[in-house]
Amino acid sequence: MSEPSYDHQVDRSHMQVSDEIAIQISQMNKWYGQFHVLRDINLTVHRGERIVIAGPSGSGKSTMIRCINRLEEHQSGKIIVDGIELTSDLKNIDKVRSEVGMVFQHFNLFPHLTILENLTLAPIWVRKVPKREAEETAMYYLEKVKIPEQAQKYPGQLSGGQQQRVAIARSLCMKPKIMLFDEPTSALDPEMIKEVLDTMIQLAEEGMTMLCVAHEMGFAQAVANRVIFMADGQIVEQNNPHDFFRNPQSERTKQFLSQILGH
């Protein structure tokens, strides 16, 4: 297998992985009724890691990352995020969610609020940040995702790529320690995908701990320090990008890569 490529020069100077554990998943299982959607998931994520999760549709990859901030409830096993175990305790769930940002396939912006209001809503109401400070932070992150001029517009006035960059900026306004991305480009037109991936690369370059469900293998090659392949609710294989693409071990992984890389 040859390696995919991505048209972006990535600065890895700040991409340091520490020994500190950000996420620990042990023997996690989840069912939807009789359907066993996640099977004995074990995963350790260190602070500063950039992990891309790949796999066919229905493999459980989106469900797994949604369990990390309790958008989905696991039935057995342990999930510990930033030292906090995720149980049914609402206080623990709120603590974890305050440390974990999440960006979805669909942008989930409030259509009746301006872009600036979308970004300041959670900091003001959840973190009790003063309005002026929240607005300054929001403008800082809109600058970072390169759309400060859109602050007073409404979501419907922006392109899909711009809306997704707003969604990323909105998550960053809560100062998360970990960012989760659930197929953030799959609802975008092809010409808008790169602008969102470039924003995510910038986050990675700054040392953000990231888990990303994605189909862009060139992005995985450029940014990830680990690629995880899932199928049938299990982690089938995981490795650094070079070895994952050059020398996949599992037949299931080889089959998947041959389909998406076209050889």
From Swiss-Prot:
Residues 23-257 form the ABC transporter domain. Gene3D superfamilies: P-loop containing nucleotide triphosphate hydrolases. GO terms for molecular function: ABC-type amino acid transporter activity; ATP binding; ATP hydrolysis activity. It is found in: Cell membrane. One of its GO terms (cellular component) is plasma membrane. InterPro entries: AAA+_ATPase, ABC_ATPase_HisP-typ, ABC_transporter-like_ATP-bd, ABC_transporter-like_CS, MetN_ABC_transporter-like, P-loop_NTPase. SUPFAM superfamilies: P-loop containing nucleoside triphosphate hydrolases. Keywords: Amino-acid transport, ATP-binding, Cell membrane, Membrane, Nucleotide-binding, Transport. Disulfide bonds: none annotated. The keyword Cell membrane applies. The keyword Cell cycle does not apply. ATP binds at residues 55-62. It is a peripheral membrane protein. Part of a binding-protein-dependent transport system for glutamate, glutamine, aspartate, asparagine. Probably responsible for energy coupling to the transport system. BztB and BztC form a heterodimer which can form a membrane complex with a homodimer of BztD. Belongs to the ABC transporter superfamily. This is Glutamate/glutamine/aspartate/asparagine transport ATP-binding protein BztD. It comes from Rhodobacter capsulatus (strain ATCC BAA-309 / NBRC 16581 / SB1003). The gene is bztD.
